[in-house]
Design a protein with these regions (language model features):
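Extracellular hydrolytic enzyme modules, especially secreted metalloproteases
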Residues: 203, 270-442, 450-457
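Bacterial N-terminal signal peptides that target proteins for export
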Residues: 1-7
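Conserved small/polar residues in nucleotide/adenosyl-binding loops
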Residues: 466-468
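Active-site-surrounding "flap" and adjacent substrate/cofactor-binding loops of secreted or lumenal enzymes
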Residues: 165-166, 170-205
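Bacterial N-terminal signal peptides
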Residues: 9-17
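Active-site-proximal segments of metallohydrolase catalytic domains
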Residues: 135-148, 191-307
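N-terminal prosegments of processed precursors
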Residues: 21-143, 393, 397, 420
Length: 468
């Protein structure tokens, strides 16, 4: 069937300082076990800057570690705390739970949490950062300046902890991840159907072929939960600093970091830390690191320098997912986070409601999790154009007619219809997406129409304003 979505005001102008970006919470409903052995279905919303677990009908939950139960939350000043009432699915609630829920306003609680999340994100966003001019894409709307055309050197460090190591069947994590990142047509029993290099080569129409260098594993001296510890619901920045510094110092014994300063500006363009265990975005491990992309010299105290170059941006994601913990996770989170490195922003909703966003159609939204992260969708026409991978074919209103819209993945073609009088800041993009190749697990197929309204004020607040 034809599947059509219209996104209005979705993409905000990205002309401000680079943001700290994070993977979205896995919003798919999942069952979690209560202390008495029963199960409740929950959903998680948000990102690194703020997230909340809820019932499927929207009531915020609090996990009480002392009882081992998810309990209905109540608001205490600015934070959630337990009401003491054990949560259950709507059809299984007792009278006490039903009466309690009549007395609370989940909308009011979520509104307060959204304000806090926005404030935290704003602090991360506006600190000054190092920025340099690099060749490649036109950089117009991107939040970073990493080369998106050619074959830049990319450093990936495998990182494990004193109590959490990589769990590969053959005992060779380095060999496994070299294959996952670089082997053409990579397959594995977790459902993998292509390598990271395959993904970016396809999405860029052959214009971007990064040289992935995988090293490690290096083992940090402290525990998994130490580095993933939270403060006010977010990863502690001092522990993240130890995580990055420790990993880079350990890797410096075998790595020449100057190789990864692709333009010679004195900064490593990016260090990717692939860490053992789980991440907080798609699991219930609260004391684990949430996958994210930060700038080290922006958010950490002091600089970090090796081989005459400083560590600039870094990115990280986990080995395992909370959905299938017995197998290595797919490439979806890496492709999402590395797309931040290239300069793309998050396109998922930053609030705790059911805002209409690209969802599974976009790797910068919930497409990260398609086919359990094994088959992220290729980048949209808009994203490709911003990265220098696609040139729009312009249509003139009232003058041009099209009868065939070529499939995006196969043709790398899309149409643009400018809105008169907006000086190129507002336009429609038409693309044809079919459920083949990397797009096999899209929720639908046919034409996607994107209404791009580039607004710096919207981006400043990190909001997706969607009108249908």
């Amino acid at each position: 069937m034809n599947f059509k979505r219209i996104f209005l005001g979705l993409f905000a102008a990205l002309c401000l300082a680079e943001s700290a970006s994070a993977a979205p919470a896995d919003q798919r409903p999942r069952k979690v076990r209560q202390a008495d052995g029963t199960y409740i279905t929950v959903v998680k919303r948000g990102d690194e800057f703020g997230h909340v677990t809820m019932t499927t009908d929207g009531y915020p939950l609090f996990y009480n570690e002392s009882t081992g139960n998810y309990e209905y939350a109540k608001m205490s000043s600015s934070t959630l705390e337990s009401s003491g009432i054990i949560a259950a699915d709507a059809t299984d609630r007792n009278v006490k739970a039903v009466d309690y829920l009549k007395s609370v306003s989940p909308k009011a609680m979520l509104s307060k949490l959204e304000v806090q999340r926005a404030a935290k994100a704003s602090v991360m966003r506006y600190r000054p950062r190092h920025m340099s001019t690099k060749s490649g894409a036109k950089r117009g709307m991107l939040i970073n300046d990493y080369p998106s055309i050619g074959s830049p050197n990319v450093l990936i460090i495998l990182v494990q902890f004193s109590d959490m190591t990589f769990d590969c069947e053959d005992g060779d994590p380095l060999g496994f991840y070299k294959n996952m990142f670089t082997q053409p047509g990579f397959k594995y029993k977790n459902g993998a159907n292509g390598s990271v290099l395959d993904y970016f080569t396809t999405s860029s129409n052959g214009l971007f072929n990064p040289k992935f260098d995988i090293v490690g594993p290096v083992t940090l001296p402290k525990s998994y939960s130490y580095y993933g510890a939270n403060y006010s619901g977010n990863d502690r920045m001092d522990r993240l600093q130890e995580f990055v510094k420790g990993a880079c110092e350990a890797a410096s014994k075998v790595v020449d970091f100057s190789k990864y300063d692709n333009n010679g500006d004195g900064y490593v363009d990016n260090v990717y830390l692939y860490y053992a265990g789980f991440g907080e975005a798609d699991s219930e491990y609260k004391e684990s690191i949430w996958p994210h992309a930060y700038n080290y010299n922006q958010f950490m105290m002091g600089s970090l320098k090796f081989n005459g170059v400083s560590i600039g941006s870094y990115t990280c994601s986990p080995e395992r997912s909370g959905t299938y913990p017995e197998l290595p996770t797919g490439i979806g989170t890496f492709c999402h986070e590395f797309s931040h490195v290239l300069g793309l922003p998050d396109h998922y909703t930053t609030v705790y409601n059911d805002a209409f966003t690209p969802g599974e159609f976009d790797v910068m939204d919930m497409g990260t999790y398609n086919n359990e992260q094994n088959t992220p969708p290729t980048h949209s026409a808009y994203e490709r154009a911003e990265l220098g991978w696609l040139e729009y074919q312009e249509l003139t209103t009232g003058a041009d007619t099209i009868s065939v819209l070529p499939e995006l993945q196969a043709s790398n073609k899309a149409y643009i219809v400018p809105v008169e009088g907006t000086n190129g800041r507002e336009f429609f993009v038409l693309e044809n997406r079919q459920k083949t190749g990397w797009d096999k697990y899209l929720p639908g197929n046919g034409m996607l129409m994107w209404h791009i309204d580039q607004d710096a004020n919207v981006w400043a607040q990190n909001l997706s304003l969607i009108h249908i």
